[in-house]
Curated annotation (Swiss-Prot):
Disulfide bonds: none annotated. GO terms for biological process: 'de novo' IMP biosynthetic process. Its EC number is 2.1.2.3, 3.5.4.10. GO terms for cellular component: cytosol. The keyword tRNA processing does not apply. SUPFAM superfamilies: Cytidine deaminase-like, Methylglyoxal synthase-like. Belongs to the PurH family. The keyword NADP does not apply. Residues 1-149 form the MGS-like domain. The gene is purH. InterPro entries: AICAR_Tfase_dup_dom_sf, Cytidine_deaminase-like, MGS-like_dom, MGS-like_dom_sf, PurH-like. This is Bifunctional purine biosynthesis protein PurH. One of its GO terms (molecular function) is IMP cyclohydrolase activity.
Length: 532
């Protein structure tokens, strides 16, 4: 293996022509022979560059609407031949195959085509065949061949050639190896995207093989803890959220910021903007307070009041455009991230004085009922499930107690149930007047979560100068059934008047009897919302 490897002949075939002309011009000025196909060759010629068509090299025209262009021994032999293997060199000479030292290919825009909602046939035609085949061939032979799969790599190659100018030019093995790894990563991601799309098109819920396709968006200082390395990858989805948001100010998002911001925005997106303002404050992926209001500022204050201590250093998510009044409330304490569909200029000006506050806008809210896939890694495998998009319409709620909830209780029950869906199990949510007043999350027993939620409600009453705990007259949501009556009785003792839970316990009759004895209204959803 010669190092650096010479670069005298390049094949360029790209869909994305960003930077192509400048790059190819530089290569040509270094004496590199240019081979190309179709539209790429046309663009190069129009720029005044001398380029040789691949069809001239292969002796075959491009055919079948461009489906067959480069799938030929004259091309793949030039990419795969080992330069220091006498038999390979002899075969090249015998068949007139010229070595190809540089391959520059970016693939048909399959992912973008799917994201744009194209029909089935259009998506099929945007599955690249010749490109991945050449990329894999060049990457396999990176002992001699350099492969580029993205325009962002052009400058790096030219710098590499400059660095090796005193050695006759060419590329080092280390550079070619890095480019080969990137190339295999690109083809793997491309094939994963095709496979995932086809599984969806064929309605295959559990394909025999599954791969995640992602592109590196950010290398982070560290992960969940400082001793952990971390990075953020994008899957190409256009779903509004932290991955697609525009950051207006503040330093780069951390691993924990991204995780918590995603949790916050997914929760607040359950509340349609047309139904009124809503705000969620998140800490460690759990809500510390959630509220609706007549204005965003009012909703924020109600969410903040639920747990003023935990809100410090939290994530704030809004379901409507951030305005100045709400911004003024938010900057009263330290907040890590604010995410909203949009922000007006007055709000941005207020935030500008808080350099460490990160502001993200998404351009809209995600559809909380849109199907998605959720992944969880375990040792030796990957758990895959549908994202929890479950919801219960009011007419499907089953009243199981003697007393039915009032209209206000029912509205609060539905609100609390939505918050419980986004709270780590075991989850107990106290709510009143469209706002949480006590949240118990992540406890190993449901009665402990109920007790903690009641204690937090009592603390809220003290901090807000209330005459009594806001748990009095509140409603309670439980993400799973009460296995015993103790958790429900704890809620009743705290002053709750109505309960929403899935039902389904062997002791439902005992729990219902306890609710009736306490004068509670209780409804069953028939749906559980465990969250781990």
């Amino acid at each position: 293996m010669t190092d650096p490897a010479p670069l005298t002949r390049a094949l360029l075939s790209v869909s994305d022509k960003t930077g192509l002309i400048e790059f190819a011009t530089d290569l040509s000025s270094r004496g590199v022979e240019l081979l190309s196909t179709g539209g790429t060759a046309k663009a190069l010629r129009e720029a005044g560059l001398d380029v040789r068509d691949v069809s001239e090299v292969t002796g075959f025209p491009e055919m079948m609407d461009g489906r067959v262009k480069t799938l030929h021994p004259m091309i793949h032999g030039g990419l795969l031949a080992l330069r220091d293997n006498d038999a390979h060199v002899a075969a090249m000479k015998e068949h007139g195959i010229g070595a190809i030292d540089l391959l520059v290919v970016n693939l048909y825009p399959f992912e973008a085509t799917v994201a744009a909602g194209a029909d089935y046939d259009t998506c099929i035609e945007n599955i690249d065949i010749g490109g991945p085949a050449m990329i894999r061939a060049a990457a396999k032979n990176h002992g001699a061949v350099t492969v580029l799969t993205d325009s962002s790599q052009y400058a790096g190659l030219l710098s590499e050639l400059d660095a090796n100018a005193n050695k006759g030019g060419g590329t080092s093995f280390q550079f070619r190896q890095r480019m080969a790894q990137a190339a295999y990563g690109r083809t793997a991601a491309y094939d994963a995207a095709v496979s995932s799309w086809m599984a969806g098109a064929a309605e295959i819920k559990t394909p025999p093989h599954r791969a995640f396709a992602g592109s590196l968006a950010q290398e982070m200082r560290y992960g969940e803890n400082p001793h952990q390395k971390a990075a953020f990858y994008l899957d190409g989805s256009s779903r509004p959220g932290v991955a697609t948001a525009q950051q207006h100010q503040g330093k780069a998002l951390s691993y924990n910021n991204i995780n918590d911001t995603d949790a916050a925005f997914e929760l607040v997106s359950e509340f349609a903007p047309d139904d009124g303002p809503a705000v969620a404050i998140i800490k460690h992926a759990n809500p510390s307070g959630v509220a609706r209001g007549n204005s965003l500022a009012e909703a924020y204050k109600a969410a903040f009041d639920c747990d003023r201590t935990s809100a410090f250093g939290g994530i704030v998510a809004l379901n409507q455009t951030l305005d100045a009044a709400t911004a003024e409330e938010i900057v009263q304490i330290f907040t890590e991230v604010v995410i909203a569909p949009d922000a007006d200029e007055d709000a941005k000006a207020i935030f500008a004085a808080k350099k460490n506050l990160r502001l993200l806008t998404t351009g809209g809210l995600p559809d909380p009922r849109a199907p998605m896939v959720a992944y969880k890694q375990v040792a030796g495998g990957l758990l895959v499930q549908d994202k929890d998009t479950g919801h219960v319409d009011p007419e499907l709620l089953e009243v199981v107690t003697k007393r039915a909830p009032s209209a206000q209780e029912l509205a609060d029950l539905r609100f609390a149930w939505t918050v419980a869906k986004h709270t780590k199990s075991n989850a107990i949510i106290y709510a009143k007047g469209g706002a949480t007043v006590g949240i118990g999350a992540g406890q190993m027993s449901r009665v402990d979560s109920s007790t903690i939620a009641a204690l937090k409600a009592a603390r809220m009453g003290t901090e807000c100068g209330m005459a009594d705990t806001p748990a009095k007259g509140s409603v309670v949501a439980s993400d799973a059934f009460f296995p015993f009556a103790d958790g429900l009785l704890a809620a009743a003792e705290a002053g709750a008047t109505a309960v929403i839970q899935p039902g389904g316990s062997m002791r439902d009759a005992d729990v219902i009897a306890a609710a009736d004895e306490a004068g509670l209204a209780m409804v069953f959803t028939g749906m559980r919302h465990f969250r781990h």
